[in-house]
Structure formats: C-alpha cells, structure tokens
A protein has these predicted regions:
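Alpha-helical transmembrane segments and their helix-start/interface "positive-inside/aromatic belt" motifs
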Residues: 1-5, 68-77, 145-149
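Membrane-interface helix-boundary motifs at transmembrane edges
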Residues: 62-72, 134-144
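Interfacial helix-loop-helix junctions of multi-pass membrane proteins
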Residues: 15-25, 90-113
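Membrane-interface loop-to-helix entry segments
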Residues: 32-54, 108-129
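Hydrophobic cores of alpha-helical transmembrane segments in multi-pass integral membrane proteins
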Residues: 1-13, 43-56, 81-86, 122
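Internal/C-terminal transmembrane anchor helices
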Residues: 141-161
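Interfacial loop at the N-terminal end of multi-pass membrane proteins
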Residues: 10-40
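C-terminal TM-helix exit segments that contain a strictly Trp-centered aromatic cap at the helix terminus
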Residues: 6-17, 82-96, 157-161
Length: 161
C-alpha cells in the first residue's frame, strides 16, 4: 500500500502539478475548468496521503517484528506497489475509462503511455521482484542477475527511440 501511494503521489505531483501534462479528469466531458481539475487532483492526493499514513502507522506499530528483517524485502515490496500504481493507472485510467493520458497534447499519446508504463511500471516491478528473490548461492548467478536491469532499461530506451 505504501508503494502504491508513493506511485500515486509521484504521478500526481510530477504530471499534474509540475509538468502539468494532464489532470486526473482531463478527458472527462463537463470537467473542463482548471479549478475543478485541480480540485479532483487534490482529492486523489488526499486519498494517497491517507493511504500512505495508514501504512506508515502500521509499519511503526510493527517495527519490533521488522527488526532484523532484510531491507531488500521492504524496498522490493515498495517498488512492486509503485509499479502497481502505474500499471493500474495505465490500464484503467488511460485505456479503459479514458479519463486522461500521460501527454494529452501529444499527437500520439499512446507512445507516452507505453513509455511511462515501461519506465515507471515495468522497470520498478522487475527491480522489486529481483530484490524479493532469494539471493543465489552461486556468485556467478548473482552477477548475471545484476545485468538484467540495465539491459531492460537499455531495451526500453531503444524501443522508445
């Protein structure tokens, strides 16, 4: 839940506020005014803050049980949640409901949707899954596993180019 909330906050703050590429309901008829768009963005952010706060409180309460746990597990779960936000946002908001796209002003918004999904959905999901894997006992396997992420990033960059 914490990674999911972080993904929603990252998306909302970067895309809605800083870059201003879209708002939550940019493509919804009848929600055209900037004031209304920003209001709905605020509702999304408030929901994400509440979700993050609840999860942080849960982590605080469970801190004694978490002592000695591997940091890899926590970071891996956070990355999977972050990736889940971007994957669900792309599938539901962009393609199923059609309430917004990553770059509305683009002549081909699908390219931006796919690039965003790859960089902030696929890459964190792979990194999170790799962190959650049991470390291999053979050091040669460990080195080959480390090479997968840079290769995936290079492949996505070439595909986008």
């Amino acid at each position: 839940v914490l990674g999911f909330a972080a993904g929603g906050l990252f998306d909302g703050i970067l895309l809605h506020q800083i870059l201003q590429w879209h708002h939550l309901l940019s493509l919804v008829p009848g929600v055209a005014g900037l004031r209304e768009q920003v209001l709905w963005d605020g509702y999304l952010h408030a929901f994400m803050y509440v979700a993050a706060g609840i999860r942080l409180a849960g982590l605080w309460r469970a801190r004694a049980q978490l002592e000695g746990k591997r940091w890899r597990s926590l970071v891996g779960i956070l990355l999977l949640g972050f990736a889940a936000w971007h994957t669900i946002d792309a599938l539901v908001s962009h393609w199923w409901l059609g309430i917004h796209r990553i770059r509305i002003d683009s002549p081909d918004p699908l390219i931006w949707d796919l690039l965003w999904l790859g960089v902030f959905g696929l890459v964190p999901a792979i990194a999170g899954a790799l962190l959650l894997r049991k470390p291999p006992s053979d050091p040669r396997r460990m080195r080959s596993g480390r090479a997968i992420l840079p290769l995936m990033i290079a492949t996505l960059a070439l595909a986008a180019w």
